[in-house]
Amino acid sequence: MSNPLPEAQSAQTRRRALVASLTGSSIEWFDYFLYGTAAALVFNKLFFPNFDPVVGLLLAYLSFSLTFFIRPIGGVLFAHIGDRIGRKKTLVITLSLMGGATVLIGCLPTYEHIGVWAPILLILLRVVQGLGIGGEWGGALLLAYEYAPAKRKGLFGSVPQVGVTLGMLLATLAVSLMAMLPEDDFLAWGWRVPFILSAGLVFLGLWIRHGLDETPDFKQAKASGNVSKMPVLETLRDHWREVLIAAGLKVVETAPFYIFSTFVVSYAVNNLGYAKGSALNAVMIGALVASLLIPVMGWLSDRIGRKRVYLSLIHISEPTRRRG
């Protein structure tokens, strides 16, 4: 049995794991929300132009919503891969998938240039994004959680979640800056800039993850030979109740989150008459507040329990959802 790491070295390793988890998660969700914001503002005009504006917007959102069906597949697929080959290698794969698809979306010709192939290719690349984010989300959480000290699991587990809102903040900021261009320039090339420049962020994330070691839990399982051949099937067979409960808990908070983070932009601009900048600024403020509060709630869950924190926040958010 190997000797435990010295305390200072262990703390340094944990910090590196948290940085890798947060950075990769932020980059992947930056890519993810770029698509959502672009779907709200430009995709209906560039990839579905032959439809009524409302129908075109619905089709753009439909392409965005595809990931809700693809992400579980990506989650199951990369959970299996992660349990077989390790967390680090799996997270490199998911980040590469997400980043590559995002850059290619920024390079896509529009309907005006290649006709029906434009929306088809857009949807295919969105499917690839869905597979990548499905694997990234669970993998980043697992990476942080398996490195966490026993009494700080909530705080460590909250760090990748900050990547969601931080990615949304950065994506909205990027589109907001480009939306300051004249409308014709924004539609012609401005919206593409954040997609293409995201390649730099992806390489940064890959570099950070390349220097990360495997988690202690995975190395211990591999050394003992206790690595399941079919981990997903065993999980569904032995822990199906827990899986269903976790999925249900996630649905309750995920549905309103996406309404307030993506749909609200087009609704504010097209139905309420707000300027694009005002709608995007509102989303950015919400993302900033969430980014600051998420680790606080993770810390609090270590003090008073996960159930109390979750149920309290669900009750607090209920009046807002009914008003929306």
Where are these regions (language model features)?
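Cytoplasmic membrane-interface "Motif A"-like loop-to-helix N-cap segments
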Residues: 84-95, 303-313
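Flexible cytoplasmic inter-helical loops of multi-pass small-molecule transporters
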Residues: 210-231
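Hydrophobic core of transmembrane alpha-helices in multi-pass small-molecule transporters
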Residues: 115-133
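Glycine-rich segments within core transmembrane alpha-helices of 12-TM secondary carriers
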Residues: 155-176
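Extracellular/periplasmic helix-loop-helix junction of adjacent transmembrane segments
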Residues: 40-71
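Residue-level detector of conserved catalytic or cofactor/ligand-binding positions
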Residues: 312-320, 324
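Central cavity-lining transmembrane alpha-helices of secondary-active solute carriers
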Residues: 62-80, 101, 284-296
